[in-house]
Amino acid sequence: MPHETLLDNQGWFKKLARRFGPGHVVNTCFLIVMLFSTLLTWREVMILKDAYVASQRNHLGSVANVLDRQLQFNMDRLIFLRNGMHEALVAPLAFSALQSAVTQFEQRRVRHFWQLELDKRRTLPLYGVSDQFVARTTLLSRESRDLANELTATLELGYLARSSAMLTLETMYVSRSGFYLSTLPTAYGSDIVSRYYQYVTQPWFIEQSQRRNPQRGVRWFTSAQPYVADEQKKVTASLPLDHDNYWYGVLAMDIPVASLQQFLRDAAEKDIEGEYQLYDNHLRLLTDSAPEQQTENTLNDRERALLAREIEKDTLGGLRLGTHYVSWERLDHFDGVLLRVHTLREGIQGNFGSISIALTLLWGLFTAMLLISWGVIRHMVKNMFVLQNSPQWQAWHDPLTRLYNRGALFEKASRLAKRYREARQPFSVIQLDLDYFKSVNDRFGHQAGDRVLSHAAGLIGSTIRAHDIAGRVGGEEFCIVLPGATKAQALQIAERIRQRINDKEILVTKSTTLRISASMGISSAEEYGDYDFEQLQSLADKRLYYAKQSGRNRICASDATQEREKK
């Protein structure tokens, strides 16, 4: 029947309320509300975080794409020049001017330095060193059978290399055969030798050997040492020239770091938040978009190590380093990585910071209101519960000692004894009586006696275990029920109670203190296998009498005849 089900549910709720108490129910409900509100807020925070990370990547990606396109143009041009030289090596032009240049080379190759020039208006001059200079190192060689073709191909390169490339400072071809061509002119004289020597000793030339660069692709090199002035720092892209498995030389482009810095600063002007930083493949800072003399966002060694570990895993990503959020992306046409550093201050001042602050304030306001409501409702429920249950509490407890009264103690103890008998677990009882209590009433009055009883009850309650129960069963008599305690454990608890009562002094009047003692008797179900509480309490009371007869302030845990035998 529906009506019966409703009654059953009401009974179930009443049992739950009696078991846990209304305070626990209120706490649980508010805890669940707090938990769900926190989870919802946390979900919004995670969504906001993902949006912030995506925004950082979008800003970085737009700048990285533009920079990559600029660098790609230069790389495509470098590859175009190499392809042109390769075609000239395979099928050289039969121009008389080129043949004349080869003849001039044969005449001048023994000179300490020399120069070949076809047309000052349309091509670039060719500079070279002597056979003796080339023979000094195994890295250089003029033993190629296609030396004449390489020479004419380099002169043809002069027509193509004259046109400027974006961001490029210098474009050059350096041959292992002792000559070079550059978009930057060289004064005729000993500068030719020193410049060629400088070229062939650079990493971008040496590292392009077939052993060190077996892939024969573009490689990047930096000259960003601390002792190099900012205006002299540059990055170099180099590409080897090969034909029939023979390495002829290196095509290279120098890009000044100042050009890259200006590009990043132009990008930063459009993006008022964040700082862009360009690093090489060793995570050495090349340049950034920060104004002059402002380097507070530079990464330290520890942060660079953390970033390097993350970069090894993916081509782009983000990482929080202290109060900075660093998003990074590898460039496709540069052997390095571009970073966008966003500080906490910039984040707070931005749109996402405003949303985060508003979300935090809303959560804090809701939490504060929830806590205030919880306190008010819990206080109201507690008062109602106390008012509702005060007659029952008064019926079960002794008003003076706030321990169970005799009837309540016997009822609860009997139920506990039955439960522990079924579980075959130990069960013990302590009967306690305050020594010479009648003389306290006679000497100091009943008010002092009440104070002694309340004091003793407080010591008993603070000494027993959490699941033990204690009650006042007579004038100055107390009974303590110890479920789960053996006789030996009960003796230890009784001794602690006796010592605490005996050690504490009680202020019975304004100028008088009193030290009291207690005698106790102990009984346990393990002695005779009897779990009847009234029998155990009676036996403990009997042993209490033996303790008093033996001199008081002591504990008796066995029959008097056994005590005498022990003595």
From Swiss-Prot:
Membrane topology field: Multi-pass membrane protein
Entry-linked Gene3D superfamilies: 3.30.70.270
Location of the active site: 476
Family matches, as InterPro entries: CHASE7, Diguanylate_Cyclase, GGDEF_dom, Nucleotide_cyclase, Rev_trsase/Diguanyl_cyclase
Binding note for cofactor: Binds 1 Mg(2+) ion per monomer.
One GO-annotated biological process of the protein: negative regulation of bacterial-type flagellum-dependent cell motility
Pathway listed: Glycan metabolism; bacterial cellulose biosynthesis; Purine metabolism; 3',5'-cyclic di-GMP biosynthesis
Free-text function comment from the UniProt entry: Catalyzes the synthesis of cyclic-di-GMP (c-di-GMP) via the condensation of 2 GTP molecules. Cyclic-di-GMP is a second messenger which controls cell surface-associated traits in bacteria. Involved in the regulation of cellulose production.
Name this polypeptide is given: Probable diguanylate cyclase DgcQ
